[in-house]
Amino acid sequence: LGPFPHTAPRATISEQNPAGTDGFEFVEFAHPEPQVLRDLFSAMGYVHVASHKSKAIELWQQGDISYLINAEPGTHAAEFIDVHGPCAPSMGWRVVDAEHAFKHAVAKGAQPYQGSGKALDVPAIVGIGGSLIYFIDQYFDTSPYNTEFEWITDAHPTGVGFHYLDHLTHNVFKGNMDKWFKFYGDLFNFREIRFFDIQGKHTGLFSRALTSACGRIRIPINEDRGETGQIVNYLKKYNGEGIQHIAVGAHDIYDSVDAISERGVRFMPGPPEAYYKMSHDRVVGHNEPIDRMQKHGILIDGEGVVDGGETKILLQIFSKTVIGPIFFEFIQRKGDDGFGEGNFKALFESIEAEEMARGDYGDQVSAD
């Protein structure tokens, strides 16, 4: 899989990386009630560091993570709210040369965004579900926000210890997973690094995990196995395809999760006690504190301590849905570069149980 997203070397434009991708820059969010987003991001440790000079757009940061809250009327984000409700209307990518990346993508078949409702004055194309992908090349020596935003406080505050965007997952209509794999592959030379076939108690999904040539942009794509599953449920609630969850990396997941829990962030139901009792059999040689894992339901995956003493462990936990059907993942990688595939079934059934408790499946399935 290569380097972790936050430690990969700076990209160059090459045959392997023809668009010159170099990582996530931001995720944009919009909500009919923007204060809901402010309260949520504050609870997660983010700080309002800057505001747009002429638009109702706020920049919230923590570590190397940037979120935009867009409350400006008449924008692409405002139109997105009309269709989807609370939503993630765009993501920004770091690229070596924004104009080059834009022209390359359009030449390969991307739809350029020609509207006047951009969050930032940079090139953009239309992506998943009508969301946008912005191309940003001011990020290495200078902030991309200096031109259009007024700074309120110092950039990149420590917050509660989340420090980079690890991956961002899409949910798509049944039959469209390959279409979107082709989109990312043809335009940006993404490649598949994992394929999953997950079966819960009542529903299932397929997932293709993709990574960019630079190694910093990871996008799993999910589609439902059937007609009544949780991906179908998301698509109904969101009124279309889009971003299912955003995963952020922690320096110390236990301290970070304790902190956001105290601030009111709630998580998906944790696994049964047997999960933790069996964790040493599944993740050999780990010495993670079971009591702290169990406190909030933190999951563990990986090979454990492998030959030669190398550690390959991944720790992860998921918030409840907090922006419409969108949720967040909090992750700490200790030598493991996967997606917690050993936990997929536990997570899947946890989401399924939550949705069944809310009656999201109606009479289509019945509990055991």
What is the predicted role of each segment?
Residues 62, 214, 321-323:
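A generic beta-sheet turn/junction motif
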Residues 3-9, 18, 245-368:
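C-terminal functional regions that serve as terminal interaction/effector modules
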Residues 86-90, 101-200, 208, 288-331:
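Extended catalytic-interface subdomain
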Residues 10-12, 225-233:
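Active-site-adjacent structural elements in folded domains
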Residues 20-32, 151-218, 227-228, 237-273, ...:
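Surface-exposed interaction/gating patches
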